[in-house]
Amino acid sequence: MLSDIEISRQSPRLPIHALAERLAIPSHQLHPYGHYKGKLSLELLKSLPKPAGKLVLVSAITPTPLGEGKTVTTLGLSMGLNHIGQPSIATIRQPSLGPVFGVKGGAAGGGHAQVVPMEEMNLHLTGDFHALTAAHNLAAAALDARLFHERKLGDQFSARTGLQRLDIDADNILWPRTLDMNDRALRHLTIGQGNAADGVERSDRFVITAASELMAILALASDLKDLRQRIGRIQLARDLRGKPITAEQLEVAGAMTVLLKEALQPTLMQTTEQTSVLVHAGPFANIAHGNSSVIADRMALGLTDYVVTEAGFGSDMGLEKFFNIKHRQSGITPACVVLVATVRGLKANSGLLDIRPGQPLPESLLREDLPTLEQGCANLGWHIANARRYGVPVVVAINRFPTDSEAELALLARAALRAGACGSAISSAFTQGGAGASELAQAVVAACEQPGKVKLLYPDQASLGAKLATLVECGYGGRGVQLSDKARQQLAQLSAEGWDHLPVCVAKTPLSISHDPALKGVPTDFEVPIEEVKLCAGAGFVYALAGPIMTMPGLGSLPAYRHIDIDDNGEIVGLS
């Protein structure tokens, strides 16, 4: 079989104007970026009828280093729906350069179910991440500049500038810097070293752009006005009296919004079969809320009958955050959940196999092993029950691999129905495109006709502590929460300041339902340690770090960039 990049280059493509014309998008509301991608004006959202399409939310079992094919299934299902005569658009997140050059690689799907051109999808796209990085770092630079000038001018600051002093506490600055790259050396650093003109010396850190609060804001904003208001609410630091200092008070919110004006517009692209895809925003699901944008979903729902969107990692991660954060803020409601499962992924979740990065895969992973698969299906059952908890029907998509036996596929299908899925179907979208996902598409159409009513895990009025406890006990199946002294103090402060009404976004490992990646399958009787709690006032949630979570990843010993190059004709090679 050809490589992903070879399939991408050989796939027939529509010029972006023709793709937009298919969707009845007026030419003046499309802003082309080259031949095969273009921004969609926010005016389009205003001109569309009330959204009448049905949203299908794609999640998965607990992911493994092998990959379960969630993006492949998301794109393949959308193609499959079009294949059976049900108009569909996919909405997915933009890839971060960090994983592209790290271990994971790109996020454009794969095989015959990918976004094309895949090079453009994975590398820069329309520059949204760079714009967001610039806007984020503008706030950081403005904060340090204000700190410097207030200290330099002292009591003369207000008289000389006409500005009120902010009295920034250099030891209580909340806003890091950001970069769209995996770079562990930037996790802890000291800035302002040198002479007096080089700024105030203090500790600082970087987060990856996908973990910036600005990325969450971009994904959750409903329009330009909402974006501007959310940015103004961002808490950048605290003053010497312990009071918050916002981007509005620093007078930088307007300029930050200007930098994000184009980034607020979704990017229209296409799959290998010319199915339309809206690509927008890119918050990670382990260290952010892990879903594509509200604006892209609303546009797509006004343009077509079925919208297939992807939530990051397993149902304990992106799916939970879709319902408890994105749905809660936007009102966007899935008609159906699709859970992606693989035979090899469930074997890996059995806890019986020793799978290590860089080591040969266990033999039983690549040959028929029904007992190991049977044990691993407990993880599938947990995720089905977890998804059903939110009140919508669940279909299991069995993403087929060449090493799967018919007996294993049949066992997995039986386990899905036994655990409460309303249907299951094998998907071969990777090798067959939309035709390989037609059975899955039919199961999804049937599921979308079933009645459903969304149920959230906790009410708005519950305390932040109660929300955390509910997430651990109901969302992860744990026994309770272990708060560090720091987290306990932070929760008390946030409660006293009136932030209890916000939802909670837990940052944790995606490799286990629990906080511990070593706990495979369906762990029980565990407590989740919460090390730190942070307010994201602009995004509209409280961010809790479960264990030693890194918001700036690092490159591994065998990074993907080693294989990426360009030939004499300007063709990129080695990108996956």
Curated annotation (Swiss-Prot):
Stored HAMAP family: FTHFS (MF_01543)
Claim: Nucleotide-binding is one of the keywords in the record: yes
Entry protein name: Formate--tetrahydrofolate ligase
Family recorded in the similarity comment: Belongs to the formate--tetrahydrofolate ligase family.
Domain of life of the source: Bacteria
UniProt entry tagged with the keyword ATP-binding: yes
Molecular function as annotated in GO: ATP binding; formate-tetrahydrofolate ligase activity
GO biological process: tetrahydrofolate interconversion
Pfam families referenced in this protein's UniProt entry, alphabetically: FTHFS
Keywords: ATP-binding, Ligase, Nucleotide-binding, One-carbon metabolism
Organism field: Aeromonas hydrophila subsp. hydrophila (strain ATCC 7966 / DSM 30187 / BCRC 13018 / CCUG 14551 / JCM 1027 / KCTC 2358 / NCIMB 9240 / NCTC 8049)
Binding site for ATP: T64, P65, L66, G67, E68, G69, K70, T71
The protein's Enzyme Commission number: 6.3.4.3
Pathway given in the UniProt record: One-carbon metabolism; tetrahydrofolate interconversion
Reactions that this protein is recorded to catalyse: (6S)-5,6,7,8-tetrahydrofolate + formate + ATP = (6R)-10-formyltetrahydrofolate + ADP + phosphate
